[in-house]
Every structure is written in structure tokens, then in C-alpha cells.
């Protein structure tokens, strides 16, 4: 068998169960490579429930910066028995399949054309942790530590990321570092490291940052002068307002009184949310809402009101698959006509289409300027893929000329 061998050029896919804390560990892996200067493109593929169903996290690593998804998986790491048959089937010939071998692999899944690597993740957790919740959470961190040995990831980069993430919280840094060490030392002692696929430090990232579009939108709204947000939670747009609130708490505070200079209202439905935004705009505040396809359907009548009455209104539409309630955790760009001609009668709405987190930030701020200048609704169109996944992006820049 000829193994796949490469440096800084591969696709790895993590197979987990959602609600088990795997997202943080997988994100730690992607950020470690990025901090080593290697371009990465992570994609989170998750179900529309809270806990218990298969979820995947796919990372394309490419030193030349080719970050679109491609066919075939070079490395699969599976800790979910529900999806293991699918996961091992997706591995390219010569690739690597890593799994929790506390329980033996079903012989019907065995392949002679790939390298199969077992890690006793459950056993290591059972031996080192008494709390069932800790066993589940740290299992994910242990396999990241093992990957550090298997792929030759700089271990200091991983521990540095943990220190940044849990700054000032030694009670969290120490156990997570210990879990990384468990996986790292086990792999070094029991498996030939590194694999044929490995990483090494690079300078191809430059000044780029790793950021999701929704966070960039929240920052853009803040930068654009927004002081009012009214919304009804809907995947995949919810984290837009979460980000806006997170940063508004830092900068929208009156230095004299300590009072907040912003308002965020979680409305009872989408109709109320857009109504509050229009009302706030009518009173002179820069205001916005964030929603997805089903919300657009419900907000259309109010968008017609804002269009007819010439009220500046900003709406961020993070699109998902439809129609009807559709598939909340799958991406699609299917709301374009619904937004372009939102509401009945002769309407032609202004749409903005960012393609990167930097453009989400810039267009997010621009939306408020355009709405005020044109006295009309402005709808900014992104999608789940851009909104909820980390993307390499040019750094966000503050313009001192902006008032």
C-alpha cells in the first residue's frame, strides 16, 4: 500500500456527536495550524438538534491558499460509532483513519488500502477522570493532543491557544493542557510519529485573520453606528446579534454614568422584531435586525411599509436552505428574489452581497450609511457557510475619517 505523503496539504475530517464539546476542540486544532502560518479552511457540518446526532468538522489545509472544499478525505478522525462506516468509506486510498479503539473496530469496516490508527480515547479518559462530563469533554482535547504528535504540530502553539482562550483561569488551562499531554505522549510512545502527512511552520498566512462572517457583521453594525438591535433567534443568524452585544458592552457605555448607550430586544417573533427596528429608525436611531429565509417571509409586509414610508432600515439575512422552515443548518443562497422584491406592489430593495468576513464588516457598516442616505431598507445577504464558519480574511480596519 502506498501511503499519502504531504506537507501542509491535506483534508482532515472529524466525526463527532453534537453536544459533546467537540466544536471547541476541533476549532483549537484549526487555529493551531493557522497560528503556525498555514492557510486553513474549516467547515462545520452539524444537525438541527441540540445533542446526540452526528456532526462533522472538515478542515482543508493548503500552503498555497487553495481553500475551497475538494473531494476526498486524507485523514478521518472518528469518535462516533453512528457514522463510522460512512467516515471510513470517505477516506482516499493511501489515507489515514483514526478512531477510538477502546472498542475493537468492526471487521466489516476494515480496509487494506488505508492506514488505520487506534487511540484508546475512552480508556484514557476513564483512567484519568472521575466526572462523566469531564470524560466526554476531555476526550476531544486528548485527540487534538494525539494529532499534535501524529502531524508534528507545535505543541507550544496549542498550549498558547489554551492560555489565550482561558486567560486568567488557571483552573481551566491546567486540566485542558493535561488532556493535550495525555494524547500527545500516548501517540509518541505507541505510534510511529509523524504520519506520512504532517505540517511545518509557514509564512503563507501573512497578516490574515481567522473570523466568521456573523461576528464580522456584528462588528460592522457597531462600527456603522448601530445602537438598536431587535431580533428573533433563528439559525444561522443568531450569532450576529450575539457578537453585536458582546462588543457593544465594551464600547457603547457612557463614560460618565456607566449606563449602556444601546438597546437589544429579543422580540416574541420576527414581525415584532422588524416593527421595533422601523420604529427605532423612525425616531432617529441606527437600528437593525438579523434573520434568515423564514423571517424574510414574515417581515415582508413591514419591509413594504419601510419602503413606502422611506424609513432607513437595515436587515442582515444569513440564508439557509428552504423553502418553508427548510434545513436550518444547511447553506443555500435562495432568498435573493424574495429579498429583491420583498413585499407586494412595486418594490425594488437594495441588496448587498459580501463574500468575505472583511466585506461583511465593511458592508455591515455601509448598510447604515446607505439606508440613511437613500431613506430605504438595505438588506445585506450572506449565508450559513460564510456566516457560521471561520474564514481567512484581511484584517478589519478602522477608518479615522469615519464620523
Where do the protein language model's features map onto the residues?
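Glycine-rich beta-alpha junction loops
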Residues: 103, 320-322, 374, 383-388
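Active-site cofactor/cluster-binding pocket
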Residues: 1-224, 228-230
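Short, flexible turn/loop "capping" segments at secondary-structure junctions
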Residues: 342-345
